[in-house]
């Protein structure tokens, strides 16, 4: 299962429908200001987006305290589902790679069908 499919499944399990692809999920969310040194505004359940300045290519689910769950491939990841951290103290190669590609974060505040979440 790829990263955006994992996010879609996680939200669907709670009755919340979000778009399929990472770049669509990024556009769908309410932006949350985030950087590697400033994680204070992130809440558990927020989506974290990674990629190049031009395009979102990866998405993860924030668990709290800068940790996130994601599904990543063999080239830049764990070849499956894992948990990594945005904190600089986490020197694992996977965490370092994705930290270098951090684009931002977003909060899901409605379903894809337009239903507002409370």
Q: Model-derived features: where do they sit?
A:
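Structural motif
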Residues: 45-46
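Generic marker of residues within folded, mature protein domains
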Residues: 50-52, 95
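Catalytic cysteine-centered active-site loop
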Residues: 1-42
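Short glycine/proline-centered loop/turn elements that form peptide/ligand docking sites
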Residues: 41, 54-56
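Aromatic- and glycine-rich peptidoglycan recognition patches
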Residues: 31-37, 57, 63-118
């Amino acid at each position: 299962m790829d990263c955006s499919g994992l996010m879609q499944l996680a939200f669907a399990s709670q009755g919340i429908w979000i778009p399929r692809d990472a770049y669509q999920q990024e556009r769908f969310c309410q932006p949350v200001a985030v950087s590697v040194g400033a994680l204070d505004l992130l809440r558990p359940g927020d989506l974290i987006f990674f990629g190049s300045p031009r395009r979102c290519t990866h998405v993860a689910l924030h668990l709290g305290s800068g940790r996130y769950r994601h599904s990543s491939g063999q080239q830049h990841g764990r070849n499956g589902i894992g948990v990594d951290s945005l904190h600089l103290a986490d020197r694992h190669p996977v965490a370092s790679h994705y930290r270098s590609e951090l684009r931002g974060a977003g909060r899901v505040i409605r379903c894809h069908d337009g239903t507002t979440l409370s």
